Curated annotation (Swiss-Prot):
It comes from Vibrio harveyi (Beneckea harveyi). Residues 160-333 form the OBG-type G domain. Its EC number is 3.6.5.-. Disruption phenotype: Deletion of all but the first 99 amino acids confers multiple defects in several cellular processes, including increased sensitivity to UV irradiation. It is not clear if this is a complete disruption or not, as in C.crescentus and E.coli this gene cannot be disrupted. The gene is cgtA. This is GTPase Obg/CgtA. Belongs to the TRAFAC class OBG-HflX-like GTPase superfamily. OBG GTPase family.
């Protein structure tokens, strides 16, 4: 199945049902009290994480989703039925972003988590709500409100422990093939990797971790150049980054400048991502004598002012890869997972939050005098309910 990690959809919550003006009528009771019921609330729109999904391709074909409208109220103090909610199933790790405000509306990082992205409209109030000691036969009601409409961008962020980054042809895909069962395409031309790939590395049966390989970065990636910027988001949940450096590039470029380019693009993209633990991995050490390779590596370390972890490997020959994987497993075992910020769910900014309070106070109320369709009844009407409904 084609890997799709981004899709734009329009979601519309259901409108609220309107309240009704109604009075009880039966034999010998010609002037019964008000019994108009409230409308039903509109249905909400949710997204829910499903571990059985791994792509957003379904949302490339259907772009509009609408929840059910609430029913109008009825006589006899009957409340309208609430509109049915609608739930969009998405892969674990998906977030929803409002395309107009760029606000993260929802994020689902574990299976079964369900978050609202559009709120249904409030129900309208029937005339029973307006009965008081001075108003025994109220002819007021309120209309249901409109459901919220949002255009959201669904973004899938892969869940991996280790993220790999570097220039094209640095050897990232070769490394992931060497240490896991993943088989990304490998060739001697740039941008062989076009989509992210995941590989599970099992050091010992009880120790394993997931590695994410993304397309290579180039200068200007933070401004949209190349393919890497589109996929950098997949590294946001990684616990450690491996910066792969080719010490003998096939285009004879300067490894020092190449390393600085990656660091610069990383910092421009996200300070949080740039602040994650990052190890330097010098690849293709088999292409030159050991002494010359060590001198080259030391030259790069000095130029970068690097004092943290670094490793020398040859991914194609698997030299040094086993030791690196053991180091990664031990590091992550001792590194506590970042605690997700437990924040209260963002309150949906909805224009009708105070609707009912305003209605009882006399605002936003529909009266029969305002309703072109109302038809007053005479006292001789004594059979059943008399209901006034605005179309």
């Amino acid at each position: 199945m084609k890997f799709v990690d981004e899709a734009v959809v329009k979601v519309q919550a259901g409108d609220g049902g309107s309240g009704v003006v109604s009075f009880w009528r039966e034999k010998f009771i010609t002037k019964g009290g008000p019994d108009g019921g409230d409308g039903g609330d509109g249905g909400d729109v949710y997204i829910q994480a499903d571990e059985n999904l791994n792509t957003l391709i379904d949302y490339r074909f259907q772009r509009f989703y609408e929840a059910e409208r609430g029913e109008n109220g009825r006589g006899g103090n009957c409340t309208g039925k609430r509109g049915k909610d609608i739930t969009l199933r998405v892969p674990v790790g998906t977030r929803a972003v409002d395309i107009h405000t760029n606000e993260i509306v929802a994020e689902v990082a574990e299976h079964g988590k369900k978050v609202m992205v559009a709120k249904g409209g409030w129900h309208g109030l029937g005339n029973t709500r307006f009965k008081s000691s001075v108003n025994r036969a109220p002819r007021q009601r309120t209309l249901g409100t409109k459901g919220e409409i949002r255009e959201i961008r669904l973004e899938l962020l892969l869940l991996a422990d280790v993220g790999m980054l570097g220039l094209p042809n640095a050897g990232k895909s070769t490394f992931i093939r060497a240490v896991s069962a993943a088989k990304p395409k490998v060739a001697d031309y740039p941008f062989t990797t076009l989509i992210p790939s995941l590989g599970v590395v099992s050091v010992v049966p009880e120790k394993s971790f997931v590695v994410a390989d993304i397309p290579g970065l180039i200068e200007g990636a933070a401004d949209g150049a190349g393919l890497g910027i589109r996929f950098l988001k997949h590294l946001e949940r990684c616990r450690v980054l491996l910066h792969m450096i080719d010490i003998m590039p096939i285009d004879q470029s300067d490894p020092i400048q190449n390393a600085l380019t990656i660091i610069d693009e990383l910092e421009q993209y996200s300070e949080k991502l740039a602040g994650k633990p990052r190890w330097l991995v010098f690849n293709k050490t088999d292409l030159m004598p050991e002494e010359e390779a060590n001198e080259k590596i030391q030259e790069i370390l000095d130029a970068l002012g690097w004092e943290d972890e670094y490793f020398k490997i040859s991914a194609i020959n698997r030299n040094g890869t086993k030791e690196l994987c053991y180091k990664l497993a031990d590091f992550m075992e001792n590194l506590p997972r970042e605690e997700e910020e437990v924040a209260e769910e963002d309150k949906v900014n909805f224009m009708w939050d105070d609707y009912h309070k305003d209605a009882i106070a006399g605002k936003d109320v529909i009266t029969e005098e305002d309703d072109d369709d109302w038809d007053d009844c005479d006292d001789e009407d004594d059979d059943g309910h008399v209901v006034y409904v605005r179309d």
